[in-house]
Design a protein with these regions (language model features):
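Conserved alpha-helical positions within TPR/SEL1-like repeat arrays
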Residues: 22-37, 68-83, 114-129, 160-171
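Boundary/linker segments of alpha-helical solenoid repeat arrays
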Residues: 13, 59, 104-106, 150-152, ...
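Terminal, low-structured helical/coil segments at or just beyond the last alpha-helical repeat
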Residues: 175, 179-205
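Residue register of alpha-helical TPR repeats
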Residues: 19, 23-26, 46, 65, ...
């Protein structure tokens, strides 16, 4: 079904690109997810690369409408690149995703901060895997700060995200030789996890 939709959109884009390019990009991004779940990593990568190309051109024409889609598609590109073993290109893709998410959140925090925080957390992990200690530490701090801001407004939605970001931050601090800071941050994360477990237990009665 996805292939049929893409074939139709390709024909429409060839004859009248303006109203149909976004539909083709969206269909390719959906196909990427389906191929990835099916273990067809190289086909998924080809599909998402094409989708990113379309979203880049759309975002140049209408940034407000399509930069969020470009960021989401770049995130999928990073995942696909990692799946085929290209960690360097995956890191570049997630860096670009984070740069776009930062820009969007700066302009409209209420709308875009919920996507920025987990993006920064993922970038922290990628940077750590690549051995970029200083940058991973800086990004971990940024991720925690983004989650703290979200938790102040919606603790039930973002509390566990903050706990996870704190765990990662503690690991990076430990890697950087900041043992005391790492212990303090890890303790905060554990306390949040215990509070959530107690809350869930109470609700279960």
């Amino acid at each position: 079904m996805a292939w049929e939709a893409i074939d139709i959109y390709r024909q429409l884009v060839r004859t009248n690109p303006a109203p149909h390019t976004a539909d083709l990009a969206r269909a390719l991004n959906i196909l990427t997810l389906n191929l990835s779940r099916a273990g067809r990593a190289h086909e998924a990568l080809a599909a998402v690369q094409e989708a990113v190309t379309f979203y880049r051109s759309l975002a140049q024409v209408d940034p407000a409408a399509y930069k969020p889609d470009l960021a989401a598609c770049l995130h999928n590109l990073a995942t696909c690149l990692s799946d085929v073993g290209d960690r360097s290109a995956a890191l570049a893709a997630i860096r670009e995703t984070a740069a776009i998410r930062r820009e969007l959140a700066e302009r409209d925090p209420a709308t875009h901060s919920p996507a920025l925080a987990p993006c920064l957390h993922r970038l922290t992990k990628r940077l750590a895997e690549a051995g970029h200690r200083g940058e991973s530490l800086q990004t971990a701090r940024e991720a925690v700060a983004a989650y703290r801001s979200l938790v102040r407004r919606r603790p039930e939605d973002f509390g566990q995200g903050l706990a996870g970001a704190l765990r990662t931050y503690a690991s990076v601090l430990e890697w950087a030789g900041k043992e005391a800071d790492a212990a303090r941050i890890r303790q905060e994360s554990e306390a949040m996890t215990e509070d959530k477990a107690l809350e869930d237990s109470i609700r279960g009665f």
